[in-house]
Amino acid sequence: MADAATGKSLVRQQGKAYMFSSPAIAGGVAIIGVLNGTLEARDANTGELLWDYQTDASKQNSGWVLTADHRFNQPLLFFDNWREAPLLAQDRQVSVGSIFSSPLIANGVVYFGSTDGFLYALE
């Protein structure tokens, strides 16, 4: 958070993943979408995490396996070349519920969209 008049940083808090959206602030709480598929509510004055919500799609675990013949694999996908794996990893990160949009707060409900194709409404 920054002081609107001076631009000086008031709160700087390390998150679990990148945050590309602007926070929605109401009642002293800053709500922000995170690239790892969680929506975080933080105290606007201290940056303390108050609660978070994880999208269902972001809970999918697609662990990497290096097979005996030195191929990276993942369900339905196999690679002959390890250089292809980072490209898939980037695709997976964007396609499993990442939150790029800024949330909206109205009538006590937090609305946000996710790359899993859903619009969420949290009370």
Please provide the spans of the model-predicted regions.
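Repeat-blade elements of multi-bladed beta-propeller folds
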Residues: 11-39, 63-82, 92-118
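A short beta-strand motif characteristic of beta-propeller blades
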Residues: 8-13, 48-51, 86-92
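Short, well-ordered turn and helix-capping elements at secondary-structure junctions
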Residues: 6, 15-17, 57
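Short, solvent-exposed beta-strand-terminating loops
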Residues: 49-69
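Short loop/turn segments that connect beta-strands within beta-propeller blades
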Residues: 3-7, 43-47, 123
